[in-house]
């Protein structure tokens, strides 16, 4: 199977991005491809739900196959982490939500959080902090075991399993220092996971 790839086109004046994605081999990734018996890793990060056709498909238990992979990773002693993709569809509740009880740390942007919870966050207008907090808590109530981490242009909000909210404002950089926003969510997730790995929290 061909390698998966994504071409990102950014409109120069508005910085609006368009993604052209080819699933390639990622569509064929299946539960049997994962062996956690000999790993010494602390964290298993799975991304992106909604782009992994075989793992997004329902397994024998009626949940997406990704749930079984995450369950086995957790049973092997790994902290599980998941990121999903901003897809314009109604699949968030059928593919992502059933997996959440197997997730220790969830990453979602404002669009994805709205799709998962049905709570409008004020995207593109003025972010509603109360709604963001409610959405983060709702994701924990849907099953996320440790942290539901939401990120958006204005910053980030994380909700712990105890319902505690942690807020972080976005960093303001000079426009000349910003080459683009492609990968911003991935960089955010990497930073949070590094902090968890190093036991900063």
Task: Locate each region found by the language model.
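Ribokinase/PfkB-type carbohydrate-kinase core domain
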Residues: 1, 5-167, 171, 197-200
């Amino acid at each position: 199977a061909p390698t998966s790839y994504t071409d990102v086109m950014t409109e120069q004046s508005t910085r609006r991005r368009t993604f052209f994605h080819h699933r390639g081999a990622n569509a064929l990734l299946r539960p049997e491809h994962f062996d956690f018996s000999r790993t010494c890793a602390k964290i298993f990060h799975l991304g992106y739900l909604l782009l992994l056709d075989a793992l997004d498909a329902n397994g024998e238990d009626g949940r997406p196959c990704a749930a079984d992979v995450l369950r086995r990773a957790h049973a092997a002693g790994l902290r599980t982490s998941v990121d999903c993709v901003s897809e314009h569809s109604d699949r968030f509740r059928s593919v992502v939500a059933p997996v959440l009880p197997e997730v220790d740390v969830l990453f979602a942007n404002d669009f994805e959080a709205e799709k998962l919870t049905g709570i409008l966050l004020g995207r593109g207008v003025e972010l509603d902090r109360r709604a963001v907090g409610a959405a983060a808590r709702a994701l924990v109530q849907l099953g996320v075991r440790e942290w539901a981490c939401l990120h958006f242009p204005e910053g980030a909000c994380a909700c712990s399993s105890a319902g505690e909210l942690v807020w972080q404002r976005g960093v303001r950089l000079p426009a000349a220092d910003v080459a683009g926003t492609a990968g911003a969510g991935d960089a955010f997730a990497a930073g949070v996971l590094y902090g968890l790995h190093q036991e900063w929290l």
